């Protein structure tokens, strides 16, 4: 991470007074459509998606250090942020081509780092699916793509947050026991690759290195990792990068995510915050679709507020300042 004066200002806007990134993620597009479609027969509309993002921004950004949105449905919400909250905008197209296992990255057609900056964003976020065991040809293609995004961000003097979602080309179900066995290596090795300074990444947004459902004492099903083994993976993950890194919530329940962060800290992971999405706001979708805006607001002011406040308390005890990694 090369910290220019301009980037320092952006990073301080994105983090709290202790240098911890307690960011709210709502750049979901395809996932949000699918969530909304569970509660109504009609296809979710652009207006519905925009409105819910605005509601979440209005109600929850007073309690977050920043918010991640997308330029497709999230622009109205960028105007609804609390004045102290920073803004990140997603640069990638949502989803991936399911007809292939390659999961190639793709930028939004009419966006650039320059345009994201002009929109008032404090950072560019890009999501990459990466399997360290894919062919060198495919992974070189992905690495070159990230180099381009990194160079754009350097040119615009804006922080670059890379979100890495590890996967296995041969295992379709990421929630399976089969994938849980290989996940630690997939996540940790991908972090090592993108910690190279050639990519010009400022912050890594990463998964926790284990599927906690399969860790002794966390789930009530099959145990794949003992607590000791899981703790060692968190420690290895911390040692895999010299960059600031933050955890994504991966759609798990709020309580489980909080317990995971405590375990990460106890295991020696010096992570620098979170970008937490569905674990905070998911319950508001049902209220919004079935009861309307006021019911969604009520949910956000009660359960949503409780989720984010509890998370903030956990972060105070567990996360460290990104400045310690600069």
From Swiss-Prot:
SUPFAM superfamilies per the UniProt record, alphabetical: Aldolase
Pathway: Carbohydrate metabolism; D-tagatose 6-phosphate degradation; D-glyceraldehyde 3-phosphate and glycerone phosphate from D-tagatose 6-phosphate: step 2/2
Catalytic activity: D-tagatofuranose 1,6-bisphosphate = D-glyceraldehyde 3-phosphate + dihydroxyacetone phosphate
InterPro entries: Aldolase_TIM, DeoC/FbaB/LacD_aldolase, LacD_aldolase, Tag_1.6-dipho_adolase
GO MF term set: 6-deoxy-6-sulfofructose-1-phosphate aldolase activity; tagatose-6-phosphate kinase activity; tagatose-bisphosphate aldolase activity
GO term, biological process aspect, one: lactose catabolic process via tagatose-6-phosphate
Pfam family, one: DeoC
Enzyme Commission identifier(s): 4.1.2.40
Keywords on record: Lactose metabolism, Lyase
UniProt superkingdom: Bacteria
Protein family per UniProt: Belongs to the aldolase LacD family.
Protein name: Tagatose 1,6-diphosphate aldolase 2
Protein's organism: Streptococcus agalactiae serotype III (strain NEM316)
Gene that this polypeptide is encoded by: lacD2
């Amino acid at each position: 991470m090369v910290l220019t004066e301009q980037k320092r200002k952006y990073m301080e806007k994105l983090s709290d007074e202790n240098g911890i990134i307690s960011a709210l993620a709502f750049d979901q597009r395809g996932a949000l459509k699918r969530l909304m479609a569970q509660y109504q027969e009609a296809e979710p509309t652009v207006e519905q998606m925009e409105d819910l993002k605005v509601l979440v921004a209005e109600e929850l950004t007073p309690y977050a250090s920043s918010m991640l949105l997308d330029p497709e449905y999230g622009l109205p919400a960028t105007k609804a942020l609390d004045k102290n909250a920073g803004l990140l905008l997603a640069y990638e197209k949502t989803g991936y081509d399911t007809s292939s296992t390659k999961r190639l990255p793709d930028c939004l057609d009419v966006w650039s780092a320059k345009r994201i900056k002009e929109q008032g964003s404090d950072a560019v976020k890009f999501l990459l699916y990466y399997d360290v065991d894919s062919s060198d040809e495919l992974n070189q293609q992905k690495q070159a793509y990230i180099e381009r995004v990194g160079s754009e961000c350097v040119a615009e003097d804006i922080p670059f947050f890379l979100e890495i979602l590890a996967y296995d080309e041969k295992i379709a179900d990421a929630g399976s026991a089969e994938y849980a066995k290989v996940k630690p290596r997939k996540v940790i090795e991908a972090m090592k690759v993108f910690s190279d300074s050639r990519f010009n990444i400022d912050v890594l947004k990463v998964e926790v290195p284990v599927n906690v459902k399969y860790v002794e004492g966390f789930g009530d099903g099959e145990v794949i990792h003992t607590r000791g083994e899981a703790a060692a993976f968190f420690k290895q993950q911390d040692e895999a990068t010299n960059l600031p890194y933050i955890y994504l919530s991966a759609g798990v329940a709020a309580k489980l995510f909080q317990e995971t962060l405590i375990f990460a800290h106890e295991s020696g992971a010096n992570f620098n915050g979170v970008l937490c999405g569905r674990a905070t706001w998911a319950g508001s979708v049902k209220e919004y679709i079935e009861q309307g805006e006021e019911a969604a607001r009520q949910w956000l002011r009660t359960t949503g507020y409780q989720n984010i406040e509890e998370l903030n308390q956990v972060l105070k005890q567990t996360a460290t300042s990104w400045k310690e990694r600069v």
